[in-house]
Amino acid sequence: MGISRRPKGNNNASAAESAPSGKPNIQKAQFDTTKKKEVGVSDLTLISKVSNEAINENLKKRFDNREIYTYIGHVLVSVNPFRDLGIYTDAVLDSYKGKNRLEMPPHVFAVAESAYYNMNGYKDNQCVIISGESGAGKTEAAKRIMQYIANVSGGSNSSIQEIKDMVLATNPLLESFGNAKTLRNNNSSRFGKYLQLQFNAQGEPVGADITNYLLEKTRVVTQIKDERNFHIFYQFTKGASQAYRENFGIQQPSQYLYTSKAGCFDVDGIDDLAEYQDTLNAMKIIGLSQAEQDEIFRMLAAILWTGNIQFREDEDGYAAVVDQSVVDFLAYLLDCDAGHVIQAITIRILTPRNGEVIESPANVPQALATRDALAKAIYNNLFDWIVERVNKSLTARSATSNSIGILDIYGFEIFEKNSFEQLCINYVNEKLQQIFIQLTLKTEQEEYAREQIQWTPIKYFDNKIVCDLIESMRPPGIFSAMKDATKTAHADPAACDRTFMQAISGMSNPHLTPRQGNFIVKHYAGDVSYTVEGITDKNKDQLLKGLLNLFGQSKNQFIHELFPHQVDQDNRKQPPSAGDKIKASANDLVATLMKATPSYIRTIKPNENKSPTEYNEKNVLHQVKYLGLQENVRIRRAGFAYRQTFDKFVERFYLLSPKTSYAGDYIWTGDSKTGAMQILKDTNIPVEEYQMGVTKAFIKAPETLFALEHMRDRYWHNMAARIQRVWRAFLQIRIEAATRIQRMFRKKREGKEFLELREKGHQVLQGRKERRRYSLLGSRRFMGDYLGIAATTGPGSKIRGSINLPANEATIFSCRGEILETKFGRSSKLSPRIFIMTKAKFYIVSQQLVNKQVQIAVEKAIPLGAIKFVSISTCRDDWFSLGVGSPQEADPLLTCVFKTELFTHMQGAMPGGGFNLKIGDSIEYAKKPNKMQLIKVVKDSQQAQDHYKSATIHTQAGEPPTSRSKPLPKGKPVAPKPFTSGRLIKPGGPGGRPSKLTNGNRPTPKPVPSPAAARPVPTPAAAAMPIPAPIPAANPIAASIPVHTRNPSLQSAQSTRAVPPPPPPAPPAPPPAPASKEPQYRVLYEFAGQSANEFSLKQGEIVTVLQKETNGWWLTKNVRGQGWAPTAYLEEVAPPPPPPIASRPTPPPPPGPPKMNGANGAAVRSKPTPPAPPAKRPVAGRKPAPPPAPRDSGMSISSNGSGNNSGRSTPTPSLAGGLAEALRARQSAMQGNAKKEDEDDW
């Protein structure tokens, strides 16, 4: 499909950028006051030296400058700022919509935009893996991703908006039940969460699903000093309603053992009361009924009261309850018998291998352990129920097409005492690190080798050996050893621990070191020492049968939902251990993540004090090392940013090549690999930017991929623009055709009204008054309001405002005229006036000059009904009188060139039709009140105009009184104006080809300059005559109003020709050749590039610097290619001095006076000869230098000497470009005038 030419004047910058061969539409640069200067590098792949220390230094620079995000290719590194930087506002969010990651600074919104765009564009499931240690900001990053996707995913449907609100409401709800304050983080996630957002084919969210992992249920019963239990307990005890306090016995957190044991009740930056309200609001949004909320808080109260049960030793050494009332209230909350509660806690049911059931009284430590197990079981199952209930509300409303997963799981943990919980957490983090290695390091390099891509292998640490150490079955790993030890000595926890330690000591693994009472595992994040004591008992994860019996005896239906399984007293089969469960969950999570396209966010904790200004370089360096950022940078710098199979690549980008697509249809008949190569060729992608593998196409730089995506996005816009352009042209043609028809119709209709009014004028005069020849012209029309008094703008509106003409009086006639003023002791005198007639009155308006300012005032306002008669003569004069008969004032005697039209309008506006027109040999009027006088009108052929003297008016003889107006003259025939000229359709036509009807596109032959010897010498032109300056008007209003006077009869002034101006000065010397804008540098030392993007240099050669960076590397270029080179190896070469400028020739002497030709006195001079072109043609692409003294002489080079240009002078073209340039300028001016004439209406 051919590229259509856009019409002129369409400033579509994006379309211009999308055309590979088009010139970019560069807009005016503006200073951006919001953009900060970049500190360090925003992408670590651009760092000058690849090392852990250099990465740490760059992160520190950016952290100190409030820049917390940095890229490693498509991986985002985030440093926790421990403060609000104001970078998550709606304005910031909107700025990342539809932008690729290179268009905007690094941000978590850019990762979310990329995941959402790729899901819609490629129809692949996406996932965002957020990793890092506890307190590094993983939960905050997950919330911001959810915020962005909910904002950009669109959808105005109420169900879609409901899903968005529910997804966002899961954050405060699950945080209150699953987060807690630790020594390292005030809002630490004590559970893992994988949120999967489900979308339909249009990219709208229709559902979601949450999977939780590894809830730290031991925190319910014990916390170390200065830590807290889960947030919900403090929210509930501080903010519970009065009904909850009365029904559930809720008191302050200091009254419960589980919330007061660590001695921390309040946390800086956390408002428990406000967050409690947020939790209740989230429950309502998700759809939890009030009954369900009541049951949830009943279980929380039961857990709190369970912790307050205390035991003492009885006389037999067994456990006995200290306060029976606490047990009674707990039984009330669990809706069961208090005796069953005491029996479940103080009596242990054992089932040996022989099948005998033994009930053994528990001592105080055993009873406390059973009590805590009861509380942990209730909270763990309550949390699972809440997650299931949320998933029920988030069930997909319609069919799902793709999904975006967000993994937020607590990070790597190392404490002074690490047990089973830390082993499980660190194991899951090892699995996530293994995914990262598999997808970014190992799999990538294996794929390069498999696809036969040129590649230099990079060494990295594969943590699979650590994962096998923990989860392997053969040879037995740590989880298998725990399970075997439990089978061997399941009744004695201490014996189980000893058996497990013996198994650990027998293992042979370089990443495992046994010690006395503990063992050390060398994780990817560091060495961790795990305590063996109690580790096997935690691995059992068994709820005692006595507690299960207690839950079964409860009458509360909600408890049966929390513990749905019935107790089988005869089942002695060992249930799955906690290690088995977490291993199965971790493997399921890995399988889910491997099915999606991952995006990575690596979070870093800058210090252990939660300080917004402290940056602990030692701790951050450790995190940089175990996160493998250095290896990631090396692979990203040498790798390929994008790879796709040939089939999918062609399916995605076939629109970009005319050989693979036509009008959106796929027309390629060859194989996919050849088609992919054809697409890259037609889009002008350099061969260095991609490689073709066996089954996939590999693109090196992400900028190349973004360019392809941009061109694909603009394809449909460009096609739509073509259709719209043709459709708009068609509509414009119809509109223009209709406009022409309407214009002609209105012209005929309005002209008919004016002609009818003119015919009425003949009837008003009754055929008794001689007519002026100009009054009978066929083009004469009765326009009425000649001064524009009824207009809203212009000088007429200013007159209307000056005389305060009422808005309800419509002006039907206005013009300028004169009135005869009679003064005592002096002869009568004509004075100018303004006549305005409305449907009610006739106004005589005077203008007087007071203090050099014109004052406009109403001199007389005569009601039309007060006019008894109008007196005129039978001659062709313009005089008439208004017979008012006022006893105080004389009748006005007026003269007006539009008298007949005035009488016609007056007859139509006169109330009751009482218009009395007296026509006689003299004009009758009251010169003084009640004193009539006659003004004689005589014919005098010597008077060119009407002349008044001594009560007599002298005028010439006119046309016969019975004369009629001549017919309307026919217009001058003109050729019909085509629709493809002027502004209707731009040059190029709607189809992109030159229009056949326009003359502007015809090729013009270029003038060939003649030899210098054959060129005639130009003749000096006559000097221009000085033009007197016009006299300024006294007032702009008066100057802008037309004066209605008769032209001198049969007299005309002889037109004089304007004297042509002198020739322009001699052209200046041609400008020197432009120096190179790009600086040149000489190579001082030999430099051998170490990577693909480093440019090898040879000593002494000259290179051009294309881009300068502050990190010590510049982008250089020469004939061999381009690449990055160290700045210390280069020295700038001074540019050569410009050549000397030749002196300008002396201008010619002033010309003499022009020769006069005979009687008419017209100036005659010979035809000027074009001046000689400059000696050297100006450099292409540069403007010719203008003459030193610009003048507007009003002449053209091809002029014939006439200066009459109807008031418009053509600007003098510059002669510095020679004859050819002058002729081209003249031709452009002529074409411009012709175009303007074509655009004029009929």
From Swiss-Prot:
Comp. bias (Polar residues): 1047-1057
Pfam families: Myo1_CA (PF22773), Myosin_head (PF00063), Myosin_TH1 (PF06017), SH3_1 (PF00018)
Composition bias, Low complexity: 10-21, 1011-1020, 1191-1226
Compositionally skewed regions (Pro residues) per UniProt: 1059-1074, 1134-1154
Disulfide cross-links: none
Entry binding sites for ATP: 132-139
IQ domain: residues covered: 717-737, 738-763
Gene Ontology terms describing biological process: actin cortical patch assembly; actin cortical patch localization; actin filament organization; endocytosis; mitotic cytokinesis
Domain named TH1: residues: 771-961
CDD domains the record matches: MYSc_Myo1, SH3_Myosin-I_fungi
Chain segments carrying region Actin-binding: 586-608
A single cellular component GO annotation: actin cortical patch
Cross-referenced InterPro entries: Fungal_myosin-I_SH3 (IPR035535), Kinesin_motor_dom_sf (IPR036961), Myo1_CA (IPR054489), Myosin_head_motor_dom-like (IPR001609), Myosin_TH1 (IPR010926), MYSc_Myo1 (IPR036072), P-loop_NTPase (IPR027417), SH3-like_dom_sf (IPR036028)
Subcellular location: Cytoplasm, Cytoskeleton, Actin patch
GO molecular function: actin filament binding; Arp2/3 complex binding; ATP binding; hydrolase activity; microfilament motor activity
Function: Type-I myosin implicated in the organization of the actin cytoskeleton. Required for proper actin cytoskeleton polarization. At the cell cortex, assembles in patch-like structures together with proteins from the actin-polymerizing machinery and promotes actin assembly. Functions as actin nucleation-promoting factor (NPF) for the Arp2/3 complex.
Protein family according to the UniProt entry: Belongs to the TRAFAC class myosin-kinesin ATPase superfamily. Myosin family.
The protein's name in its UniProt record: Myosin-1
